[in-house]
C-alpha cells in the first residue's frame, strides 16, 4: 500500500492542507507544537477510527470549527482508493470509495498503519492487557475475522461472568462451549503470531544491536511448544472444570486468553526491569518494524510505518541503524525536531511551521 495524498480540513491546527507523500521515506521536521504529530494522528485515525492521543475524536476538531474531515488517496495492488472520515459532535462518518462504513471492524485492515511513538513504552512497562492489546491489534489488521473472534470471546466471557455472579451453574456450563471455542482460537492465533514475530524480531535485532532478545506468549492453555487448536481447547475445558468452584467464590472467570501475557526478555531477563530507556525504545522500534515484516510476509499487507518524534526516543547511533532497516519496509513517515541529513536515504523532507507544510527535498514530487 502507498499513500499518495492526505487532505485535512479543520483538524487540530490545520485549517486546510493537502499533502503529497513520497513512496519511501518521508521525514517531517519542525519545532515543537507546529503540527508534525497531527499528520501521523490523521493517518492513524483513518486506519483505526480512533486516535492514539485522545479518547474523544471531537478533541481534534480545530477550535471554532464544527467538524473535522480527513481524506487519503492511496493505492493497493495497483488499484486507487479513497478513504475519508468526518467527525462532529454527533459522531463520525467514514467512507471507503464513497461507500459508508458503519462498523470499525469493517475499517480495520483497509488502511493499515503501524505507529511507533514514545507512548509505546506502555507495551513494556504497562499491564499485561497492554501487550495483549498489541497482539490483538496486529492480528486485527491482518484479518477482520480475528476482530470477530475476539469480540465473540469477550461476549461469551461477559455472559459467563454474569452467570457466575448469579451463581447459575446451568448458565455457566452453557457459556463454557462458546468460551472454549473462541478463546482457544484466540490463544492459538496469538501464540502462532508471537512465534513468527519472535523469529522476525530476532533477525532484525541481530542486524542492529548484539543483545539477545525474545518474545514468548505465556498462557495456561498452552503447555507445549507447538500445540494444535484441539490441544488448547482440551486444556481450556479441563482448566474451566477444575477452576469452577474457585470462579464461583471469586465471582469471575480465572482462566483464558484474557489472562495471558506476552513476555519480552533481553539476555533472558525481563525487559521492563533490566533494560535501559534506550534499549526499551530501540526494542519497541524493532518490534514495530517486525510487525510490518510480519504483515508483509504472512498476509501480503504493506502497512505505512509512522515514527513520531524519533530523536526524542532514540540516540543517533540507534536511529541510524533503525532507519537503515526501514529502507526495506515500504512507505515510512517520521517526525522530528531535527532536519534530517539531505544526503541520507530520505526520499522526501518536509518542514512544518505553524501548520504550514513545505517540501524541502526533493524540489518536487
Curated annotation (Swiss-Prot):
Residues involved in ATP binding: 30-37
Keyword ATP-binding listed: yes
Pfam families according to UniProt: SMC_N
Gene3D superfamilies, alphabetized: P-loop containing nucleotide triphosphate hydrolases, RecF/RecN/SMC, N-terminal domain
Domain of life where this protein originates: Bacteria
Statement: the UniProt record of this protein carries the keyword DNA-binding: yes
Keyword entries, A-Z: ATP-binding, Cytoplasm, DNA damage, DNA repair, DNA replication, DNA-binding, Nucleotide-binding, SOS response
Any one biological process term the GO annotation gives: DNA replication
GO MF terms, alphabetically ordered: ATP binding; single-stranded DNA binding
Cellular location(s): Cytoplasm
InterPro entries: DNA-binding_RecF, DNA-binding_RecF_CS, P-loop_NTPase, RecF/RecN/SMC_N, RecF_2
Any GO CC annotation of this UniProt entry: cytoplasm
Family: Belongs to the RecF family.
Function (record text): The RecF protein is involved in DNA metabolism; it is required for DNA replication and normal SOS inducibility. RecF binds preferentially to single-stranded, linear DNA. It also seems to bind ATP.
Protein name: DNA replication and repair protein RecF
Amino acid at each position: 500500500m502507498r499513500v499518495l495524498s492526505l487532505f485535512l480540513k479543520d483538524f487540530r491546527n490545520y485549517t486546510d492542507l493537502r499533502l503529497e507523500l513520497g513512496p519511501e521515506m518521508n521525514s517531517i521536521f519542525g519545532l515543537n507544537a507546529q503540527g508534525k504529530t497531527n499528520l501521523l494522528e490523521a493517518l492513524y485515525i483513518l486506519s483505526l477510527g480512533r486516535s492514539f492521543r485522545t479518547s474523544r475524536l471531537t478533541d481534534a476538531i480545530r477550535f471554532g470549527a464544527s467538524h473535522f474531515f480527513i481524506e487519503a488517496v492511496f493505492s493497493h495492488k495497483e488499484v486507487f482508493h479513497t478513504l475519508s472520515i468526518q467527525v462532529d459532535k454527533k459522531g463520525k462518518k467514514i467512507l471507503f470509495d464513497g461507500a459508508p462504513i458503519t462498523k470499525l471492524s469493517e475499517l480495520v485492515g483497509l488502511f493499515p498503519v503501524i505507529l511507533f511513538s514514545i507512548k509505546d513504552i506502555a507495551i513494556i512497562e504497562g499491564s499485561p492487557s497492554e501487550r495483549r492489546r498489541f497482539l490483538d491489534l496486529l492480528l486485527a489488521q491482518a484479518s477482520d475475522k480475528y476482530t470477530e473472534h475476539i469480540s465473540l470471546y469477550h461476549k461469551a466471557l461477559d455472559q459467563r461472568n454474569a452467570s457466575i455472579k448469579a451463581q447459575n451453574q446451568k448458565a455457566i456450563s452453557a457459556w463454557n462451549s462458546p468460551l472454549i471455542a473462541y478463546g482457544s482460537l484466540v490463544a492459538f492465533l496469538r501464540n502462532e503470531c508471537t512465534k513468527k514475530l519472535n523469529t522476525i524480531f530476532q533477525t532484525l535485532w541481530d542486524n542492529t544491536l548484539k543483545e539477545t532478545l525474545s518474545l514468548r506468549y505465556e498462557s495456561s492453555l498452552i503447555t507445549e511448544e507447538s500445540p494444535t487448536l484441539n490441544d488448547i481447547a482440551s486444556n481450556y475445558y479441563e482448566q474451566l472444570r477444575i477452576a469452577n468452584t474457585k470462579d464461583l467464590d471469586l465471582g469471575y472467570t480465572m482462566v483464558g486468553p484474557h489472562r495471558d501475557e506476552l513476555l519480552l526478555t533481553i539476555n533472558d531477563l525481563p525487559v521492563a526491569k533490566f533494560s535501559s530507556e534506550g534499549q526499551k525504545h530501540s526494542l519497541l522500534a524493532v518490534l514495530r518494524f517486525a510487525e510490518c515484516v510480519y504483515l508483509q510476509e504472512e498476509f501480503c499487507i504493506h502497512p505505512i510505518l509512522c515514527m513520531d518524534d524519533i530523536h526524542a526516543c532514540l540516540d543517533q547511533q540507534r536511529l541510524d541503524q533503525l532507519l537503515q532497516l526501514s529502507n526495506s519496509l515500504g512507505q515510512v513517515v517520521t517526525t522530528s525536531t531535527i532536519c534530517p541529513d539531505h544526503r541520507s536515504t530520505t526520499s522526501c523532507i518536509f518542514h512544518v511551521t505553524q501548520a504550514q507544510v513545505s517540501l524541502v527535498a526533493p524540489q518536487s514530487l
